[in-house]
């Protein structure tokens, strides 16, 4: 619990990702999911890769590094996931700021770039994955690739409270006050 409290404090002091969000006249953000996706689409590739790095670190990965190189074979970064004191996995990741679907050829190309370099791969996109790409990612006999589409990416930002701040709203419970009418 203390670990999560410390992480929450650090996040509160961190620079927000969604600082460009548009607010309604009452100060409440409207349709924040599409706003966040629009913000991410405007980020340069290196910025989106650094966001992926931050998400992976917050999710428990260690030694997360962005390669930041052209000619990297589609590998945007790597990290280590320590499952327990005895087992860890080297994981490579690729980032795609897409409004469209990621195709199965892109999953195959990423897997080819991974060959002999990691135990697992992750492709993170602002878009979606075609059904064929999903099948390719989990193909028998091939290293597994985790697919994180735009919806799942937003869920991770929400859960980790990165670039998003939860807001509590209150509704009047009239029934409660009625008992004090007389």
Where are these regions (language model features)?
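Mixed-charge (Asp/Glu-Lys/Arg
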Residues: 1-182
């Amino acid at each position: 619990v203390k670990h999560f409290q410390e992480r929450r404090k650090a996040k509160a002091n961190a620079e927000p990702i969604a600082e460009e969000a548009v607010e309604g006249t009452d100060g409440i953000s409207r349709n924040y999911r599409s706003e966040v996706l629009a913000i991410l689409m405007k980020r340069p590739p290196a910025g989106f890769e650094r966001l992926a790095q931050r998400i992976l670190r917050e999710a428990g990965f260690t030694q997360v590094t962005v390669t930041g190189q052209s000619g990297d074979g589609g590998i945007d970064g790597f990290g280590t996931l320590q499952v327990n004191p005895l087992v860890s996995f080297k994981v490579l990741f690729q980032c795609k700021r897409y409004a469209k679907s990621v195709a199965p050829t892109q999953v195959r190309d990423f897997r080819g770039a991974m060959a002999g370099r990691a135990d697992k791969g992750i492709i993170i996109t602002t878009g979606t994955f075609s059904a064929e790409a999903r099948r390719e990612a989990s193909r028998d006999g091939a290293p597994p690739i985790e697919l994180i589409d735009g919806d799942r990416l937003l869920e991770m930002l929400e859960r980790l409270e990165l670039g998003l701040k939860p807001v509590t709203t209150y509704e009047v419970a009239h029934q409660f006050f009625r008992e004090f009418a007389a």
